[in-house]
């Protein structure tokens, strides 16, 4: 290359024998311009171009498919990544990690694989074929990049879909190998990088250039020095890290100093001295104080710029010449590189969204030791176990010959255990970055892969913001289960042909679409006939478990219609969302005639669990129900204050009770009125303050229901019309009215010294404009509330409770506050007073919850339905003896003595699609019921090996005899622990001669350990249905006797726990030594040699996750189960590239305004007042804020371009920002004779007028976008040439505006000389500004 430099010896240039890429070529040309100037540089560059073309022609490099060489390591790298993904998928299937953790690990695994392949690509080319055309072209700097070559011979990895979500299926193939059909479809998401994207980007960049040029087309260099002393500071050290030399040099080179620079009292640079390469390197090397430089944004020249504020020209490196159109150059410099910017940040390769962390590795083999008290267990972002330390943690690595001590910073993850042996280079800790980037919360929905029932643990609570919905929150990390089962249901109310636990075959009728009659049960009629005939017209026995004893369990509300037996009330159940409402209907045959009865609603949670002070029932008295709008006034009612411990909870309204809502007795008043909300003012046919009669047409389609005074008030976009019934009184003296304004007048009081009120009345003073005031005298409705609870029905509370400890407290509540306005909508009546029945008992350790059950008891042909509430630590299982009749169907059939005959029409029957066992379930969404059929495919049998210790222990325990004891357990119908419950206790089953259900953790009564024995041959399923086949099947005594007798075996001293009935087990658990589990599920039956497991899918949910649905709810495949909330790190704004530049140039809002903005301004004003001693510090802060906003805007735009590898001088952006911030908005009327409030004017113009008139001008600084700034200039010709031509010209003509033709555009439109370049001197001569600048000297 030495022959290209004829002046090389004179300049003493060194000879470099190395490859020149694009960056090195730029540096070479820059140095040539600085040393030899533009002429020699152009000559040398032309010779380089010619030499390059000649060498390329001689080489004749072509690209073929054989030149695409894939790295040999790709095979095992992809295989290793797939193995990692398989392990992660298995952990997710076992419930060890949730979906977000699995996605994170998948992303990082494939990202690392893709990056390893990228790093292996270049060494592979160098070793195999250094002169490979693909290798030379990719690193030549002319065309192509490593990213494109990586797609040709490497892999793409994970990509994003159009919504920004990562597709969990990596693209493993490259273009050389060929994409599969699935990979090709996924790759189509990146089509925005194709022809359409290029066209859109080119047009957007062109329009952006046009807008920017419109803003600054009049900016021309017309002075040498404006005399300003302002500028900006350039910090050589920013924060804790030094700025890169490249950015510092780009900022300093070509600038002019605004102040002298000193190093240790020695001046190394003076004001107005331009900064070259040597001075810039000297300032960086000496690390001088922040450099104060001049900038175009602080130039004092009006509508122009001076040479010293602009600095050196980027073209030739000298101080800018006079007459240079720097505005147009700035607009084009910013807009033209827009074609190189991407529309989004994700385009070619995979996406990595991991945490910013640094790994700490072990330097040698050894044992890790640290203090376990200083760490606590946690989970990594991949779901792996780890430890986290709050403070600095000292770790010692003890090797064979050496000891290494290191300290881990706080909030770091420790990936090893104490006293664990680690190998060299093993990761032992993960230290997070000190400055963590901003995070955003993302929601991920998890969908069900199985059809069945939803189950969860006690770590789930109801979401308070969704009181009436089906949304629940996870209290801490736990599992959610979907138990398998086939769903059968219908939109109509279905009539089941079978009962729970019946066996059905394929195509067997399950239900019939038929309405159920009203079949309430009372004490006058207790006997019912059983339907003995089958549904097929012939005698056919349906296989069932009716021959064995069964447990009637209504914990999950298996019966749809249940009845509470009482004296005067018939109760029918109705399923509504997550609560079981039992409306009470009064029996007119036994009640008082002509008296409306109150409506009692029993409110029991779906799981039957009630806490202390929970609302048990609600009584709505129809006497306190209104059908018209009005105002509530507290009269003489007595208000009782309620403490926090006795707060009444239950429904959404009760949660908001204030301390004065509970009433002891008295009277309250209701002032009726008619209210209408209107949206069209033109449709109103009456006037405000007019008096109308009942039936008057007030709008086109509304007639008034009452007569009275019309009051019309506009509230935002709506119109409220109120009709106040009553009389109108015009008083003689106005001063006497104020005493009675807005007050209630009791009966018998003299009013206005003229008449006496007979009833309660309400006075309201109205003063219409320009008319005589008057007073509407409105009628008042009086309601009385007794001191004690008024439950008119003889409700038998003794039947509803068990034991003396349980109590029912009654309280009356007024649902609305004093003076609250009530509005009736859609003619729906409103209840004013509500009576609450609240459960209460003495608080004990063993009785923390109450469990309610709707049970059906049948003895000697008599069926009784009772609601029982029992106090226990855990749910109670009720045992009952069903009558053994061969023709017995379900409990529904036993109630239908007056039902319509059942038709055998085949078309209206629901047929079974599977063979299996029926389980009747209530349908959450419909009024009818649903049937779930557990087919053989939903269950699996696990056989215990005869040689295993489990089997031997069972046989030995069966052969052993034990003593039988009898104990009595108190309680109505008997008390037994429910095995299939959601309590956290584990009920283990031990083997003896009689299988013992050992309740080891919490007995029902007392603190002793009770072991309830079930006979040897038994079957217990997940529905808590226990069936025994032994000789002791009839040992249970009369059902209505409060004392129950159960056989109890002697507790085995060394029982061998095996499994628990109803236990949910995961697939990874090993029960049998020979046969692994086929999948996760629930144990529904235990036999001597085998287990029956109901298959299930389990999902791990983290804390604060949302569960959609109820416990035991039917879930279809594809339904939303969980919504996980997790945080991910932002990589800047979502909008990047060209759209981000456009957003910044148009001054659109990026982030939301802080809610504490006013408080922040007050704090800043207080600080400025303390510093300056003046209360006007806010004005100084306003100036500083605008200067900092300019710098921030410049940095934001530069950040976008630098992230895409585009270099733009700061001076171009500063010129644009200067014009965007050059206008102010007049906000006061102090100079109303000069400027109008709301007018946009130049800041310099406002300052000159302020100095001329010696009067303060109040204005606010404005940040205008490029479009608006182009339409608010001093030249209406330039505005009309941009957009809205007709409007701009018409307004300019009406306002009589004058265009002084100072810009380039208006002179071009009118055909004049452009005031720039060679036309600059002539424009100065004609404008009469000879004294400002001398064209010969430029001063």
From Swiss-Prot:
Gene expressing this chain: rpoC2
Binding site for Zn(2+): 226, 299, 306, 309
Reactions listed under catalytic activity: RNA(n) + a ribonucleoside 5'-triphosphate = RNA(n+1) + diphosphate
Principal location class: plastid
Species in which this protein is naturally found: Cycas taitungensis (Prince sago)
InterPro entries noted in UniProt: DNA-dir_RpoC2_beta_pp, RNA_pol_beta''_euk, RNA_pol_Rpb1_3_sf, RNA_pol_Rpb1_4, RNA_pol_Rpb1_5, Rpb1_funnel_sf
Cofactor note: Binds 1 Zn(2+) ion per subunit.
Keyword Cell wall biogenesis/degradation: no
Keywords: Chloroplast, DNA-directed RNA polymerase, Metal-binding, Nucleotidyltransferase, Plastid, Transcription, Transferase, Zinc
Cofactors, names only: Zn(2+)
EC class (word): transferase
Enzyme nomenclature, EC number: 2.7.7.6
An example Gene Ontology CC term for this record: mitochondrion
Annotated protein name in UniProt: DNA-directed RNA polymerase subunit beta''
Location of the protein in the cell: Plastid, Chloroplast
A Pfam entry, by short name: RNA_pol_Rpb1_5
Family note: Belongs to the RNA polymerase beta' chain family. RpoC2 subfamily.
């Amino acid at each position: 290359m030495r022959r290209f430099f004829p002046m090389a010896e004179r300049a003493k240039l060194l000879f470099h024998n190395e490859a020149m890429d694009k960056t090195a070529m730029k540096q070479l040309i820059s140095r040539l311009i600085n040393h030899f100037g533009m002429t020699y540089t152009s000559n040398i560059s032309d010779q380089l171009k010619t030499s390059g073309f000649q060498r390329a022609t001689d080489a004749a490099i072509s690209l073929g498919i054989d030149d695409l060489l894939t790295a040999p390591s790709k095979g095992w790298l992809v295989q290793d990544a797939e193995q990692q993904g398989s392990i992660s998928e298995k952990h997710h299937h076992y419930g060890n990690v949730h979906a977000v953790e699995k996605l994170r690990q998948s992303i990082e695994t494939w990202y690392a694989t893709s990056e390893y392949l990228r790093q292996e690509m270049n060494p592979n080319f160098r070793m195999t074929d250094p002169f490979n055309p693909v290798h030379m072209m990719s690193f030549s700097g002319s065309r192509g990049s490593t990213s494109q070559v990586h797609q040709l011979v490497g892999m793409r990895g994970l990509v994003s879909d159009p919504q920004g979500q990562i597709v969990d299926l990596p693209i493993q193939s490259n273009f050389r190998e060929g994409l599969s059909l699935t990979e090709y479809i996924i790759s189509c998401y990146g089509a925005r990088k194709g022809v359409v994207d290029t066209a859109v980007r080119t047009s957007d960049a062109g329009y952006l250039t046009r807008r920017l040029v419109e803003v600054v087309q009049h900016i021309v260099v017309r002075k040498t020095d404006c005399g300003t002393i302002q500028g900006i500071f350039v910090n050589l050290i920013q924060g804790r890290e030094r700025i890169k030399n490249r950015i510092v040099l780009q900022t300093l080179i070509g600038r002019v100093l605004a102040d002298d620079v000193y190093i240790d009292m020695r001046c190394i640079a003076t004001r107005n001295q331009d900064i070259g390469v040597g001075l810039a390197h000297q300032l960086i090397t000496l690390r001088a104080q922040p450099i104060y430089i001049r900038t175009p944004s602080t130039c004092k020249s009006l509508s122009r710029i001076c040479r010293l504020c602009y600095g050196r020209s980027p073209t030739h490196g000298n101080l800018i010449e006079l007459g240079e159109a720097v505005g147009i150059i700035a607009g084009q410099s910013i807009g033209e590189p827009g074609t190189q910017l991407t529309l989004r940040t994700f385009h070619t390769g995979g996406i990595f969204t991991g945490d910013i962390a640094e790994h700490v590795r072990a330097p040698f083999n050894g044992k890790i030791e640290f203090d376990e008290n200083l760490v606590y267990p946690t989970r990594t972002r991949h779901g792996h176990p780890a430890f986290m330390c709050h403070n600095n943690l000292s770790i010692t690595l003890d090797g064979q010959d050496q000891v290494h001590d290191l300290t881990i910073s706080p909030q770091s993850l420790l990936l090893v255990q104490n006293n664990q042996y680690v190998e060299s280079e093993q990761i032992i800790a993960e230290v997070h970055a000190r400055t963590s980037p901003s995070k955003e919360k993302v929601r991920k929905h998890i969908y069900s892969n199985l059809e069945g029932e939803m189950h969860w643990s006690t770590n789930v609570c109801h979401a308070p913001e969704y009181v009436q919905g089906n949304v629940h929150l996870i209290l801490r990390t736990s599992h959610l289960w979907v138990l398998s089962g086939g769903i059968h249901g219908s939109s109509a109310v279905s009539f089941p042909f079978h009962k729970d636990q019946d066996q059905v075959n394929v195509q067997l009728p399950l239900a019939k679409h038929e309405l159920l009659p009203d079949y309430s049960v009372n004490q006058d009629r207790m006997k019912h006939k059983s339907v003995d005939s089958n549904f097929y017209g012939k005698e056919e026995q349906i296989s069932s478990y009716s021959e064995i004893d069964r447990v009637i369990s209504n914990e999950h509300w298996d019966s749809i219609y249940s009845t509470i037996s009482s004296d005067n009330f018939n109760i029918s159940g109705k399923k509504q969302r997550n609560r079981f409402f039992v409306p009470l209907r009064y029996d007119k045959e036994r009640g008082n005639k002509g008296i409306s009865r109150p409506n009692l609603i029993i409110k029991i949670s779906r799981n039957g669990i009630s806490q202390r002070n929970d609302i048990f029932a609600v009584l709505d008295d129809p006497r306190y129900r209104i059908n018209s709008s009005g105002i509530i006034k507290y009269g003489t009612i007595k208000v009782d204050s309620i403490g926090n411990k006795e707060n009444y909870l239950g429904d959404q309204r009760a949660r908001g009770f204030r301390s004065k809502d509970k009433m002891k007795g008295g009277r309250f008043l209701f002032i009726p009125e008619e209210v209408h909300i209107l949206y069209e003012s033109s449709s109103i046919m009456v006037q405000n303050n007019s008096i109308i009669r009942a039936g008057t047409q007030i709008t086109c389609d509304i007639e008034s229901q009452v007569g009275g005074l019309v009051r019309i008030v506009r509230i935002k976009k709506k119109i409220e019309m109120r009709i106040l019934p009553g009389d109108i009184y015009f008083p003689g003296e106005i001063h006497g009215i104020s005493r009675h304004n807005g007050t209630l007048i009791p009966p018998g009081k003299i009013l206005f010294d003229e008449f006496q009120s007979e009833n309660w009345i309400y006075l309201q003073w109205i003063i219409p404009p320009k008319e005589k005031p008057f007073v509407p005298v409105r009628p008042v409705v009086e309601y009385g509330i007794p001191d004690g609870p008024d439950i008119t029905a003889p409700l038998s509370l003794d039947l509803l409770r068990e034991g003396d400890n349980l109590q029912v407290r009654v309280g009356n509540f007024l649902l609305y506050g004093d003076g609250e306005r009530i509005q009736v909508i859609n003619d729906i009546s409103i209840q004013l007073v509500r009576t609450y029945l609240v459960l209460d008992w003495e608080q004990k350790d063993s009785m923390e919850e109450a469990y309610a059950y709707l049970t059906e008891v049948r003895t000697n042909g008599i069926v009784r339905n009772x609601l029982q509430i029992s106090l226990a630590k855990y749910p109670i299982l009720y045992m009952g003896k069903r009558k053994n009749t061969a023709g017995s169907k379900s409990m529904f059939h036993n109630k239908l003595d007056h039902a319509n005959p059942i038709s055998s029409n085949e078309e209206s029957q629901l047929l079974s699609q599977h063979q299996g066992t029926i389980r009747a379930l209530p349908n959450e969404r419909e009024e009818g019921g649903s049937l779930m059929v557990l087919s053989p495919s939903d269950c699996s049998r696990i056989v215990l090996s005869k040689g295993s210790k489990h089997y031997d222990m069972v046989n030995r325990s069966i052969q052993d005899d034990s003593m039988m004891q009898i104990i009595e357990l108190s309680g109505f119908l008997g008390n037994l622990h429910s095995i299939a419950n959601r309590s956290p206790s584990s009920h283990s089953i031990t083997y003896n001669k009689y299988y013992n259900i050992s309740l080891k953790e919490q007995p029902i009564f007392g603190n002793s350990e009770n072991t309830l024995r079930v006979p040897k041959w038994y079957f217990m399923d997940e529905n808590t249905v226990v069936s025994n086949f032994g000789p002791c099947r009839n040992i249970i005594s009369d059902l209505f006797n409060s004392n129950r007798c159960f056989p109890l075996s002697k507790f085995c001293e060394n029982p061998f726990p095996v499994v628990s009935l109803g236990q949910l087990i995961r697939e990874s658990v090993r029960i049998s030594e020979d046969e692994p589990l086929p999948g996760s599920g629930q144990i529904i039956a235990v036999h001597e040699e085998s287990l029956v497991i109901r298959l299930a899918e389990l999902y791990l949910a983290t804390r604060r996750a949302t569960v959609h649905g109820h416990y035991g709810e039917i879930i279809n495949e594809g339904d939303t189960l969980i919504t996980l909330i997790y945080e991910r790190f932002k990589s800047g704004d979502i909008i990047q590239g060209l759209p981000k530049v456009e957003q910044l140039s148009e001054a659109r809002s990026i982030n939301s305004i802080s809610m504490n903005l006013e408080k922040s301004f007050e704090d800043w004003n207080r600080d400025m007042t303390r510093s300056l001693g003046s209360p006007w510090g806010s004005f100084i802060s306003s100036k500083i804020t605008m200067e900092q906003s300019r710098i921030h805007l410049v940095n934001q735009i530069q950040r976008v371009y630098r992230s895409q590898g585009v270099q733009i001088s700061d001076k171009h952006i500063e010129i644009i920002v200067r014009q965007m911030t050059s206008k102010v908005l007049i906000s006061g009327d102090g100079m109303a004779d000069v400027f109008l409030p709301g007018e946009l004017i130049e800041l310099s113009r406002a300052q000159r007028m302020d100095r001329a008139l010696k009067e303060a001008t109040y204005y606010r600084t404005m940040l205008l976008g490029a479009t608006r700034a182009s339409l608010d200039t001093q030249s209406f010709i330039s505005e009309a040439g941009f957009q809205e031509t007709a409007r701009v010209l018409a307004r300019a003509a009406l306002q009589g505006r004058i265009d002084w033709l100072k810009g380039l555009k208006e002179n071009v439109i009118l055909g004049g000389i452009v005031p720039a370049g060679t036309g600059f001197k002539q424009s100065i001569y004609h404008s009469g500004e000879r004294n400002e600048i001398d064209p010969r000297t430029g001063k």
